[in-house]
Swiss-Prot record:
GO biological process, any: response to jasmonic acid
Gene Ontology molecular function: flavin adenine dinucleotide binding; squalene monooxygenase activity
GO CC aspect terms: endoplasmic reticulum; membrane
Upper classification of the organism: Eukaryota, Viridiplantae, Streptophyta, Embryophyta, Tracheophyta
Pfam families (alphabetical): DAO, SE
Cofactor(s) this protein cannot do without: FAD
Protein name: Squalene monooxygenase SE2
Family: Belongs to the squalene monooxygenase family.
SUPFAM superfamilies tied to this protein: FAD/NAD(P)-binding domain
Length: 545
């Protein structure tokens, strides 16, 4: 009897424990459901998923594979633009001028202090004029640029832009990047159909493979919000966290820039950028205001000496300063001593997009090249002109799949201009860098002497660099003309087996520089775009109701 009572008590305890466990589990599920509903009312729950090896914040609507029709129907925007840098601000103004309702979301709307994006080539200025934004270089103390001066081994030569056929106002411009962007933001925000908001976009909202909008943290960073539009254009710059879902990013960092400002001194060649072919890599000087000269020292590799422990200052004084033109030496040392040294990795990334309905990439988020030639803004503004012209015939952007197919033509139409500037930047950087290889040394010397010849030998390359004549065949011709000129210098007047071998290595080295870049850009799209079917895409026809 005792044993039986003990078993009965144990059974009762077990049943009570099981009932308590079941009640706790039901209570947990009920609480979890209430929390989820509360978060959805506030703007949606968030979670993390891995896309292409990178973490991406996704909304509950993305996780469930849909966003409600009410959310989309409730939006009055035609286009969402992520980022209000050069590309984003110019695009917002351009699309709004065409009557689109534009919502711009920018991480930081205060004026930035950057060491790149400070030189706009004449070709880029012409695109500004075409977009109606040329007045944005006014009232920021921007300086006109009429060409470049090259220095190497105590020699120098001046290369002027071929501006004779253009209006007197056409020239390059150099300025503080932050001032220029603020002017463009102000101009875009002055239009009644542009809404510019400070916030951090964390993800794209997708439904069945179509981008419907974005989720973002508001200015205070506490609340999540969502914005919806038929077309989302991502222009969030070189540090883009959204590009992974819209392209295959293959980012290379060949070098870093170390930035200094020299004050109250003029450059030896007024209104010209200065490029010193130093060892191990180039040094740039150009004016960014009436009293300031920007100096950019290229340091190969992904790391620079430490600023904190003085290694970088020591490197600049001992390795770089002796190669600076004498006229700038004292100001260069003074700028180092002042201590306001900034660094920036130089990225390059060929454009390799995924055609995604409802979304598009632009600017440095989409395509980057070495900043040596200052071509980035020219490419971005040229792309914006193309996008504007492609979208102009369209009244409605809601048919995402049809719009996506139509906009595939953009990727082909942009190639001749963008690929020429990209290839020139990558090739010129490699040619201008010092090398222990004798053939590479000969190529570098030949390039300097070829540009010093004048006539077509200087006007052709500088027209390419300026963005005034961005033709792939012209680039190809001049690049190999430099190589052949180098071989000719070796073989004349008395060729020898050693010189012939060196000449062969020079041609081989030149091919090894340019052909991989052309391959990454796409040979067919770059040189023969008219053979690509997307080149001929016509605007979709809107059916009448």
């Amino acid at each position: 009897m005792e044993l039986e009572r003990s078993y009965r008590e144990n059974d009762e305890y077990f049943l009570m424990f099981a009932a308590t466990l079941l009640f706790g589990f039901v209570l947990y599920l009920f609480t979890l459901r209430r929390r989820r509903r509360r978060r959805e009312k506030k703007g949606g729950a968030g979670s993390m998923e891995i896309i292409n090896g990178a973490y991406k914040m996704t909304s509950s609507s993305e996780v469930n594979g849909h966003c409600t029709p009410e959310d989309i129907a409730g939006s009055s925007d035609d286009v969402i633009i992520v980022g209000a840098g050069v590309a984003g601000s110019a695009l917002a103004y351009t699309l709004a001028k065409d009557g689109r309702r534009v919502h711009v979301i920018e991480r930081d709307l205060t004026e930035q202090d950057r060491i790149v994006g400070e030189l706009l080539q004449p070709g880029g200025y012409l695109k500004l004029v075409e977009l109606g934004l040329e007045d944005c270089v006014n009232e920021i103390d921007a300086q006109r640029v009429f060409g470049y001066a090259l220095y190497m081994d105590g020699k120098n030569t001046r290369l002027s832009y071929p501006l004779e056929k253009f209006h007197a106002d056409v020239a390059g411009r150099s300025f503080h990047n932050g001032r220029f962007i603020q002017r463009m933001r102000e101009k875009a925000a002055s239009l009644p159909n542009v809404r510019m908001e400070q916030g951090t976009v964390t993800s794209l909202v997708e439904q069945k493979g179509t981008v419907k909008g974005v989720r973002y943290k508001t200015k205070n960073g506490q609340e999540m919000s969502a914005a919806y539009a038929p077309l989302t254009i991502v222009c969030d710059g070189c540090f883009s966290n959204l590009r992974h879902s819209l392209c295959n990013p293959k980012v290379d960092v060949p070098s870093c820039f170390v930035g200094l400002i020299l004050e109250n001194i003029d450059l030896p060649h007024i209104n010209h950028g200065h490029v010193i072919l130093a060892d191990p890599s180039p040094i740039l000087f150009y004016k960014i205001s009436s009293t300031e000269i920007r100096c950019l020292v290229d340091v190969p590799g992904q790391k620079v000496p430490s600023i904190a422990n003085g290694e970088l200052a020591h490197y600049l004084k001992t390795s770089v300063a002796p190669q600076i033109p004498p006229e700038l030496y004292k100001s260069f040392i003074a700028a180092i001593d002042k201590g306001k040294i900034k660094t920036m990795p130089n990225r390059s990334m060929p454009a390799d997009p995924h055609s995604t309905p409802g979304a598009l990439l632009l600017g440095d988020a989409f395509n980057m090249r070495h900043p040596l030639t200052g071509g980035g803004m020219t490419v971005a503004l040229s792309d914006i002109v193309l996008i504007r012209d492609l979208l102009r015939p369209l009244r409605d952007l809601h048919d995402s799949s049809t719009l996506c197919k139509y906009l595939e033509s953009f990727y082909t139409l942009r190639k001749p201009v963008a690929s020429t500037i990209n290839t020139l930047a990558g090739a010129l950087y490699k040619v201008f860098c010092a090398s222990p290889d004798k053939a590479r040394q000969e190529m570098r010397d030949a390039c300097f002497d070829y540009l010093s010849l004048g006539g077509i030998c200087s006007e052709g390359p500088i027209a390419l660099l300026s963005g005034l004549n961005p033709r792939p065949m012209s680039l190809f011709f001049h690049f190999f003309a430099v190589a052949i000129y180098g071989v000719g210098r070796l073989l004349i007047p008395f060729p020898s087996p050693r010189k012939m071998w060196l000449g062969a290595r020079l041609i081989s080295g030149a091919s090894g520089i340019i052909f991989p870049i052309i391959k990454s850009e796409g040979v067919r799209q770059m040189f023969f775009p008219a053979t690509v079917p997307a080149y001929y895409r016509a605007p979709p026809i809107t059916k009448k109701m």
